[in-house]
Swiss-Prot record:
Name this protein carries in UniProt: Probable transaldolase
Tagged with keyword DNA repair: no
Cellular component, GO, one term: cytoplasm
Single Gene Ontology MF annotation: aldehyde-lyase activity
PANTHER family: FRUCTOSE-6-PHOSPHATE ALDOLASE 1-RELATED (PTHR10683:SF40), TRANSALDOLASE (PTHR10683)
Gene responsible for this protein: tal
One Pfam family named in its UniProt record: TAL_FSA
Protein role: Transaldolase is important for the balance of metabolites in the pentose-phosphate pathway.
Transferase is among the record's keywords: yes
Protein's cellular compartments: Cytoplasm
A GO BP entry: carbohydrate metabolic process
Length: 217
């Protein structure tokens, strides 16, 4: 499963990238706002750092506006993925932009029907939001399993990009189901390294080592 990092924080991306943990990056208007930087400037810097797909989101609500914004964003770098919402206008924009050979990430997906439409429209990625479904007392991972089954049934090439990830368990579940990609905040990816038994075992080793009075260097 590929790891995308969901942030516009250059330092956080660089730290994970140096460990080989970044296969791509996703951004959205909220993350750009949080960065406090110009969208084209920060996106260009991310694209120069990361070889994989970098999602930059349109903000127009009509298809023509999304298409025009998508084409403009695509000028930033060759690895730009144009992000559009899963609305009818977004599907129209996806069809045009993907037909031009551009990568398109259709976002804000909350149903298998929506994911099926996105695949038919030529989406490169579909981004189902699991955390927000969990907030509604639904199991967001059930949606990932449904989409995986549908895409496998018909050989769709659209990649399932699990989004709105809140925990390391979300990452594990996405991998078990067979998602192609999971995008998560830097903190969630780093939290995957944590386990209480690892900490407990390390504490025991350090206590015993101290008793030896030895030094390795």
């Amino acid at each position: 499963m590929k790891f995308f990092v969901d942030t516009a924080d250059i330092d956080a991306i660089r730290e994970l990238h140096e460990l080989g943990m970044v296969d791509g990056v996703t951004t959205n208007p909220s993350l750009i706002m949080k960065s406090g930087r110009d969208i084209k400037e920060v996106t260009a810097e991310i694209c120069a750092l990361v070889d994989g797909p970098v999602s930059a989101e349109t903000v127009a609500l009509d298809a023509d506006g999304m298409i025009n914004e998508g084409r403009e964003l695509a000028k930033i770098a060759d690895n730009i993925t144009i992000k559009v919402p899963l609305t009818w206008a977004g599907l129209q924009a996806c069809k045009v932009l993907s037909g031009e050979g551009r990568m398109v990430n259709v976002t804000l997906c909350f149903s298998a029907n929506q994911a099926l439409l996105a695949a038919k429209a030529g989406a490169t990625f579909i981004s189902p939001f699991v955390g927000r479904l969990d907030d509604l007392n639904m199991d967001g991972m059930d949606l990932i399993a449904e989409i995986r089954q549908i895409y496998d049934n018909y050989g769709f090439e659209t990649e399932i990009l699990v989004a709105s990830i809140r925990s390391a368990n979300h990452m594990k579940d996405a991998a078990l189901i067979g998602a192609d990609v999971a995008t998560a905040p830097p903190g969630v990816i780093k939290a995957m390294a944590n386990h209480v038994m690892t900490d407990k075992g390390l504490d025991a080793f350090m206590a015993d080592w101290a008793k030896t009075g030895q030094s390795i260097v």
